[in-house]
Amino acid sequence: MNNPDQVAKLLSSDGIKNIDVNLLKNQTLTKLNDVINSFPKGESFAKRIVNASESAPINSGSLICQNKGEGVRKHYHPEADEFWVMIKGLHKFEIGKDNKEYIAEPGDIVYSPKNEFHKVTVISEEQGIRFAISLEEKKAIYE
């Protein structure tokens, strides 16, 4: 799914309002606070800030910001693992066949292997911000 329009459509269907997945060039240093502050305060957003599609098996990183109760629907990726680095707020992850719940806070890293269902929901009053790392050309199979 390397088509930015397809990625934007999926993110939009999960309630994200401001979407920018057209990374023009990787930056040597990305100031996350600058990226966060470039979007309207209080609104959800997704911004691709890493794309190493020419050189790495896990090659895409997007900063995702959502409000309480927002998240991504239960799905899995048949050809790629996915990682998240928690930046702000609390997130509830449901991962695996048994929907095991994990509460992730800033500084935590969450991992879901390929073919494992996972769902993410922001549970804090403040916005939840996470950095999602995975394969750019990955399929998402929804439950």
Positions of the model-derived regions?
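Ligand-binding loop in jelly-roll beta-barrel domains
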Residues: 105-106, 114-141
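Conserved short histidine dyad/triad with adjacent acidic residue
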Residues: 62-78
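A short beta-strand-loop-beta hairpin characteristic of the jelly-roll/cupin
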Residues: 80-106
